[in-house]
Design a protein with these regions (language model features):
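Short N-terminal segments immediately surrounding and downstream of signal-peptide cleavage
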Residues: 19-38
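Auxiliary, metal-adjacent structural segments of Zn-dependent hydrolase domains
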Residues: 35-103
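Short pre-active-site segment immediately N-terminal to the catalytic Zn-binding motif
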Residues: 108-123
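Metalloprotease/metallohydrolase-associated module, dominated by Zn2+-dependent proteases
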Residues: 144-220
Length: 220
C-alpha cells in the first residue's frame, strides 16, 4: 500500500577522486553512484550561490533574472541540510540532467546542461521538489519521499508527461515534480516550509501520508 505514497529513491584523497571505483565506464549508473556516495569528487563542485554556476558559462549575465529564486531555494536547502553540486557530465548517464539523492541529501546538476537559465531553473525546482517530498515523509534523514499535493491537483499535462517518461511506480512523485519544475516559486515555498519546520501545517498531508507520519511519531 505504501508504494503509492512513499518511495525509497533507488534513488579519495583531498585532491584526486577515487574514480577507480567506476567499473562500468563513465556516463553510466555506476559512475553516477560513485558521485552520489561522494567517492568520486573530482570536478564535482559545491554551489554556494548562482554565480558558482553562471560564471562557468559565457552568458553569465543572462542568469540575473533567476538569481533571487535560485539563491532563495539554495539557502532553504542549506538550512535543511541539503547541498547542491555542479558536476561534470561524465558522472551522469546520457541525457540525465540532474538528481536528488535521498540518502546523502544532495542535489547534483549536470554541468553539460546548465548553461541556459530556464533549464537550470527547471532542474533546480524539480530536484528541489524531490527534496521537499523527502521532508514531507517525516525527515530528510530517512530515504523515503511522499507526495505533497493531492494527485487530483496536478495538472493533467504533467501527469501525462510523467507517465510517458517514468516507470509507473514513480509517476505520482514525478508528476508533481514536473509541475513544480515549471512553476515559479513553487519549490522555493515548499523548501522554505520545510526549513521552518512547518511542512505539515502549510501542506496538508494526504490521508495515507498522514497515517504514515502518525504511525512513525512525526505528528500527534
Amino acid at each position: 500500500m505504501w508504494k503509492y505514497i512513499l518511495a525509497a529513491m533507488t534513488l579519495s584523497t583531498p585532491v584526486m577522486a577515487d574514480e577507480s571505483k567506476i567499473t562500468k565506464g563513465y556516463n553510466s549508473m555506476d559512475a553516477m553512484g560513485c558521485m552520489l556516495v561522494r567517492e568520486c569528487k573530482n570536478d564535482v563542485d559545491e554551489v554556494f550561490s548562482l554565480l558558482d554556476i553562471s560564471s562557468q558559462y559565457d552568458n553569465t549575465e543572462e542568469f540575473t533574472s533567476v538569481a533571487a529564486e535560485f539563491n532563495t531555494m539554495l539557502m532553504a536547502m542549506n538550512q535543511i541540510g541539503i547541498k547542491v553540486f555542479l558536476a561534470d557530465q561524465r558522472y551522469f548517464p546520457i541525457m540525465h540532467r540532474g538528481v536528488y539523492h535521498t540518502v546523502s541529501n544532495n542535489v547534483y546538476l549536470n554541468k553539460r546542461y546548465m548553461n541556459q537559465p530556464h533549464i537550470l531553473m527547471q532542474l533546480m525546482r524539480h530536484e528541489g521538489w524531490h527534496a521537499a517530498q523527502d521532508c514531507m515523509a517525516g525527515t530528510i534523514d530517512n530515504s523515503m519521499i511522499a507526495i505533497i499535493k493531492p494527485e487530483d491537483d496536478v495538472p493533467m499535462i504533467w501527469r501525462v508527461m510523467a507517465e510517458r517518461t517514468y516507470p509507473s511506480h514513480s509517476v505520482p512523485w514525478e508528476a508533481e515534480a514536473q509541475w513544480a519544475g515549471r512553476t515559479e516559486n513553487m519549490t522555493m515555498e515548499a523548501l522554505q516550509a520545510c526549513a521552518r519546520g512547518s511542512m505539515w501545517t502549510e501542506y496538508k498531508p494526504t490521508p495515507l501520508t498522514y497515517k504514515w507520519l502518525k504511525e512513525n511519531n512525526y505528528v500527534d
